[in-house]
Amino acid sequence: MKELKKHYQRAFLALIKAYKRYYLGVWIIKLPFYKLTSNQHKITKWQAKRDERLEFLHNALKTFKFLRTFDEESKKWLNSPEFKAKYLDTKHPYPPLLNPDSVDYKCIPAELAWEINLPLPPNYDFIYFVVWGCASRSTLTYFSQEGLRLSPFCSDLPTIEQYKLTFDFLKNSTIKIKKILLIHSYTSNFIGEKYLYLVVKNVPVFIVVRDPISIVKTWANHTHPNPNKINKFNLTFDYHQVLDCIVYDSGKNPNMDNEGVYLASQSCSFAQKKYLPYFTKNPKIIIDASDLSVDNAYRTMQNLGKKLNFTLTLPKKDYVNKSNTSTFHNLFPFILICHSGDLTKMFKGGFEQRNMKSLEYKNSIKIIITDGIRGNAWRRNRDYTQLNGIESQQILFFISQKNAQKLYSDKSLFESTKEYLQGFIKALNKRIALESKNQLAEKDILEYFAKNKAQRQKYKTIFDENLSFYKELCPDIVESWKYYNEFEKMCAELDKSKERQNERI
């Protein structure tokens, strides 16, 4: 193989580097000094560093030995009856040049693994087929908060780079931690036939589905980041102005005439026909997005845990405030700066006396304002705690432990901050009500389709092409989709009406 020589040279250089780091590093002479000063913390760090470098050396040696014997092992495998039966006779388009069942994945660089068609390391417990608009953000949050590891994904990466990223994640992961292989259903940036052929482990495929009219509604109401959003503000800012930053993909208000709604639906939510044929042999676990609502999420996750062999560690209350909508996807987080110098000009719902100075003060107190979905990262951060005395169904407030003591000890500033945040919460509720009033509902989408034949036919085509899988795998769920069934009925009636008109002519 042309590239094999390059990999061999790299492995040789990596081995020399690992040897030098372990045996000749300056860090070795530090141990006697640490022992002399009885610095146990430094000794522990030294030991951990030594173990890390020893493991690096062992892996470098394994890789070097593996590449030396690559040609011989590959020839044995390619001439074996097992290879013939499994790959040649079945005309597999990407046969591996080494036996995946006997190879040591830790010895193989990800780039070489791709070149020799090696399947992804079978170090994952199930596959989550991510369909945007089907509670995917909430689902990923639920899995993550329960300690399950999610394989990395970046939609902008070329297929080979995504493979390398996933390969390294899986080969370096510990066996004890449950891991999920994520397959994102994009058509605009299709992950590629070869990548999907290299996902071979026969584990369950988990899918969340949703009424397609509701998915279209999500894209019609979808927002994007506002470059003019005020991310950091203080007690003098008018919170109504701070919250007036929602920008829809269609402009100031949702609009089904925007071609972006169709393109987003097609490329991010209706790509089943491109992906699911590669997983026909895998068992499927399919639920409806409604099962992951705030009221149902905890019970649903318990049931999934039984089927996918993981145990919930968090109480039911931690599944509250996790609902996500595309409307507020780009609204949070905010940073509120609290400083006693702003109290005389604090905004109380009337005239604003904005003061920008405290935004740059080093001794100011910062409060993170975020939603339930993003709140998990702050919950896990031991340096932060939730702010006392403020409750909201929509948002969470986090403050560093150090700043919390500082704020609570300043009674005047603390009470004023609570008053300001109560006003912020009321303004947020008003903004939510206003945006909800402006947004399109499923009935609006159906009315639009009834009046626009060309658009109706475009959407029906992608529905028919992709939903056939669900009609076969979970017909009961498809039958429960109120708006989709109304859409199908409407299309049939309008088509019949058109046929009658043509017959009269």
Please annotate each region the language model reported.
Residues 4-54, 58-64, 69-75, 80, 191-404, 468, ...:
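PAPS-dependent sulfotransferase catalytic domain
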Residues 2-119, 311-505:
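PAPS-dependent sulfotransferases, especially Golgi type II membrane carbohydrate sulfotransferases
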